[in-house]
């Protein structure tokens, strides 16, 4: 088991991670210098406050640790590290893992069998990830396992359950729900028409509101131009909640122009 250093570690220990190399991924390319430095500061807090536990003899390097911490820090860049206080451990498998689970089908029959998982979390439990999918989360494809699980944790701060409604002002809940459910219906309609593989967005978002919030949070940070185009109301709600505007960040950095899409 690897224990990430705690707050009592001297500052020199915090600086032993290769932060410039860790930040050199497409997902973080649009960050300004000030944003990048604040993100690194938050990532250092993640490293101090959480325990990273590699499983199945996975060897974790400082670069891997740093990038994992950066991805946890990104959604709370403007919210603050306190929003991640719902867990203390990160379990890291080498690749997707198998769980034996029970589930109920559409007619009420209960089944039991193996289920392949990319990651998972619960209200007070650890965040479970796998390195293969984390490694695929550094680009701007709309897929990001760490942001997905972090969104669930943020969602669970509202009454301890994942409902698709994180802690937001009461006056905004009705409009939030309306926008989220409209997106779910549109995503399901597209998947029914084109098939899950042909759909422009992950059809898993249509399965339930909690998954819609988590999946669309992945797009918000890693493919904001797609989310803004498909579901502008959802994008606006997410921008207010996360207090970030990744699409504007792309424009300001020059990585995206109005003619790009």
From Swiss-Prot:
UniProt-recorded Gene Ontology molecular function terms: aminopeptidase activity; metallopeptidase activity; zinc ion binding
GO biological process terms on file: proteolysis
Ligand binding (Zn(2+)): 111, 148, 152, 211
Cystine residue pairs: none
Gene3D superfamilies: Collagenase (Catalytic Domain), Glucose-regulated metallo-peptidase M90, N-terminal domain
Keywords of this entry: Aminopeptidase, Cytoplasm, Hydrolase, Metal-binding, Metalloprotease, Protease, Zinc
Short name of any one Pfam family annotated for the protein: Peptidase_M90
Family from the record: Belongs to the MtfA family.
Name of this chain's protein: Mlc titration factor A
